[in-house]
């Protein structure tokens, strides 16, 4: 499942960072989920908890923040949000975009000029935005 692969990458990132910083414990992790990716937060959280088990990150607080998807037309410079056009997507299209966000260009066009030449300004992908660690001695 795609969410498990994402969770695995997040966990590896967190544990690598903690090791580099000499952490004795990971206390909290903040993860940004891009709206365009349409990730199932509950599955990612469950997977992270399972993958953290037996590590210095076991029991860490996991916080998710959704980043709104914003697009900008390269033709007319119009900016718009996914929520303004999301009703045009059926479940198959949502699934296609979930696995390969770049295909959004095949299904969306600028609401102002109709161009398919646009950039995803934000709201794509998944990334670790913060890691709170504890070092020996409680710092």
Curated annotation (Swiss-Prot):
Superkingdom, natural source: Archaea
Protein name as annotated: Hydrogenase maturation factor HypA
Binding locations of Ni(2+): 1-2, 98
Family to which the UniProt record says this protein belongs: Belongs to the HypA/HybF family.
Residue positions binding Zn(2+): 73, 76, 110, 113
InterPro entries: Hydgase_Ni_incorp_HypA/HybF_CS, HypA/HybF
Record's keyword terms, sorted: Metal-binding, Nickel, Zinc
Database matches in Pfam families: HypA
Subunit comment: Monomer and homodimer. Could also form hexamers. Forms a complex with HypB.
Single GO term (MF): nickel cation binding
Protein's GO biological process: protein maturation; protein modification process
Gene from which the chain derives: hypA
Matching Gene3D superfamilies: 3.30.2320.80
Protein's job: Involved in the maturation of [NiFe] hydrogenases. Required for nickel insertion into the metal center of the hydrogenase.
């Amino acid at each position: 499942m795609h969410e498990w692969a994402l969770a695995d990458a997040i966990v590896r990132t967190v544990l690598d960072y903690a090791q580099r910083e000499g952490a004795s414990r990971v206390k909290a992790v903040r993860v940004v989920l891009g709206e365009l990716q349409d990730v199932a937060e509950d599955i990612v959280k469950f997977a992270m908890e399972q993958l953290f088990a037996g590590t210095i990150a076991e029991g860490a607080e996991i916080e998710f923040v959704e980043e709104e998807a914003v697009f900008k037309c390269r033709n007319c410079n119009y900016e718009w949000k996914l929520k303004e056009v999301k009703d045009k997507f059926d479940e198959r299209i949502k699934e296609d975009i979930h696995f390969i966000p770049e295909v959004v260009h095949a299904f969306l066009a600028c609401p102002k000029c109709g161009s398919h030449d646009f950039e995803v300004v934000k709201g794509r992908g998944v990334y670790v935005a913060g890691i709170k660690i504890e070092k020996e001695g409680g710092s």
